[in-house]
Structures are given as C-alpha cells and as structure tokens.
Swiss-Prot record:
GO terms for cellular component: cytosol. The modification Phosphoserine is found at residue 99. Its cofactor is Mg(2+). It comes from the Bacteria. Mg(2+) binds at residues 99, 242, 244, 246. Keywords: Isomerase, Magnesium, Metal-binding, Phosphoprotein. PROSITE patterns: PGM_PMM. This is Phosphoglucosamine mutase. Pfam families: PGM_PMM_I, PGM_PMM_II, PGM_PMM_III, PGM_PMM_IV. InterPro entries: A-D-PHexomutase_a/b/a-I (IPR005844), A-D-PHexomutase_a/b/a-I/II/III (IPR016055), A-D-PHexomutase_a/b/a-II (IPR005845), A-D-PHexomutase_a/b/a-III (IPR005846), A-D-PHexomutase_C (IPR005843), A-D-PHexomutase_C_sf (IPR036900), A-D-PHexomutase_CS (IPR016066), Alpha-D-phosphohexomutase_SF (IPR005841).
Amino acid sequence: MTLFGTDGVRGKAGKKVSAVNTMRLAMATGIYFKQFAKTNKILVGKDTRRSGYMIENALVSGLTAVGFDVIQIGPMPTPAIAFLTENMRCDAGIMISASHNPYYDNGIKFFDSEGNKLNRSEEEKIEEIFADDDALEDAQVTGKYIGKSKRIDDVIGRYIVHIKNSFPKSLSLAGKRVVIDCANGAGYIVGPTVLQELGAEVVVVGDEPDGFNINEGCGAMHPENLAKVVLDKRADIGLALDGDADRLVVVDEKGETVDGDKLMAVLAVHLKNTGELRGDGMVATVMSNQGLEEYLLEHGITVYRSAVGDKNVVEMMQEKGVNFGGEQSGHIIFSDYAKTGDGISSALQALAYLVSTGTKTSEAFNPYESYPQMLVNLPIEEKKPLESIEGLEQLMEQVEAEGMRHLFRYSGTENKIRLLLEGKNEKALETMMDECMDFFKRTLV
C-alpha cells in the first residue's frame, strides 16, 4: 500500500487524510520510531488550515495510544519543525501541511530525530505497519504507559534566533523596504518578525489566516499580487512564502518575478566567493534550466541533478558532500542552517547578497540567458506506468531529434502529469508541447 508521495502523505482532508487514517498512520509511525526512542517525545506542528485541528488531534490520539508523549507547538513553518525536533531532543517531528495546495487539502510530513525527512525505505516500513491490523492492535498500551500531550506556545523564539543567525552579523537590513507575502500560512509570524528585528522596513501581506484562505490568491503561487504591492510601496524587494514557508519566490523592485534557477545561481557563486560553498558544487533537479548548469560551470561549480522534491535534493547533497541546493520552484537548501527547504532562511541569503554588493534586485539576479522552457501541468484521470504507455518512447525520440530536453513525470501530490520541454527555439517548443499534450490527453485523460 502506497501512502507517501514526493513529500509525505497528502490528499483531501476528511477523505484520504481523514481522522481515522491519520490516527492509524500515527500509530504506525509511533511503532516504527519506538525502536529508536531515547526521550519518548514527538513534536507536532501545523500550518493554518482549519483541518489541522482534526489531524492534530488524530495524531495525538494515535501516538499516545502506542506510548509516546506529544509536544504540540501550533502553527510553525516546516523547516522550524525540522530544526526544533533536533533542538528539543525529540525522537521524531511531524508537520501537518499540504504546502502550496488549497485549504481543503492537507498532509503530514515526518522528520527523524536529527530533523531529516524520511527516506523511501523508512516510508515503506511505516506503510507496512499501517496495513498490519495485528501490529497496530498489539502495540496499543494501557494504564500508566499511555502517553500524554502538552502544548508549548513559546518555542517560536528558538527558531527566530536560529534563523537570524544565518544572516551575517556584520550586515543590517536598515534602509531596505521589504514586502513579505506570508500566504496566510505558517510563516505569518516568523517571517515579518525576523525581517523587522534585522532592521528592515517591512510591509506585510497575507498575514491574516482564517483557516480557509491559505495560498488563496497570495503567496509563492501568486507572485503577481506581491508585485503590485512592491510597485505601490516602492519597495526594494518582494518575498513570497508558500503555505508552510519552505518555499521562496522573489519579486524585484520593478515587479518582475525572479527566476528560481537564477536566484540559486547567484547565491551559489556568492557562497563560493565567500568560501562557504562546500565541494565546489550544488544540487539542482531535473527541472532546472540548462542555462544554470552552463553558467555555474563557467564559475567552477559543478551542478548535480536529483529527482524532483527537496527531500531528493537533500539526499544528493549529502551523497555529493555539498551544502547548497534547491529547486527552480523555490525550495532552496543551505544545509549549514537548514535541513530542508526554508523560505525565510533563503530570503535572508538573498538579502545578505544585496546588502553586501549594494546592487538592486533586478540587477543582481539575472546573470545569464535561460534556455526557453515550457511547463504544463495536465490534469489526468489515472497514473498509468509511463513505460507501459504505447507510443511514448517514439514521442520522446521525436522530442530529442528536435534537439530538445524533456521531462514527463506524474505529480506526487495531485492527479496531474507535468510536461517539461526545453530547447533553443520557443516556437518549436510550443509546437512540440501541443503534440505532447495531445498525446497524453489521448492516453491518460
């Protein structure tokens, strides 16, 4: 039984992510982590969705039923859960969030005692326990062995101090006007607080969560709204987080969205110049533009490509011995400060570069010409194994014969197939994308 997608368990709250399934998953997770338990504590945080209350209570029920104590810390960014799990010496951490998805979805992400996301092997073991009725029945405890839960509301300060330490002490944001869009999500307190404490003049939008407005017309998925505020307020930069604040999208002072690959490219070169880039390399995903790779190669930096998902980026970073990586979509990891994508920490790295170089945002993050790319998210009815789709191999050969790079993959969280084409001729890309869409509509829709 497959529960986990590219980033934990995710689905419609009350359906796939129901109270019953969540409690069962919590018990399975507790059983798995019992073998490593040292403090018998598991940390639980969430974003601002209404369904988070239901899921949080179901998690607490399942975990305490198998003997774990639970610490509930309320709305908090995903990277904060990764940090605080290790900082507070918990045996595991759990984040309730569906990231950039609409409010009616929710999800559950798991971290080990060191703040690392679980690998596929660990997820499979939890899935096996989840499906084993006898294992779940036998693991339930009674009497004094049943766990307890408590809520702690002041741990946010630990994370704020940690994040601020990623910003050079020799620099200040004084004189910078920054607009931050918190997506009515988990970063609505931390993001503005950190920027203000570092000296910036801060304009905040998307900081009034009501349980239903997370990501709704705001945040990293809607930078056009941030752009309007940046222009209206004559700000130096705009920063957009997603619902769980593990992603960053930057808007320059002209209201233009900064390409995620170009942001990573500039930061990678800056880190190398300051002696902070380990291994003269970085990890990007198969979605990143070829222009990124060519630009960094000119600066003596090797680009390693992982599968999509910040978890896969982190695993390859560890494998290659590098401390910087990320995704075009805005998940950026600087592992000296965070073990997962961290939108606020990434924002501070970008701001530190602007302050130290004295450049405008529009001038700083446009270091090369990108290859034309087209990305389409095509809704589908079923996810057939790609290798079983008749005619797909011939289609890919046709794409390659046109001198284009392609990536066809299913979304790990939605019923969609993502179609990426990259090449030198934009018109040819459009024509080929039409052919690809027609093909997948015939075979999958």
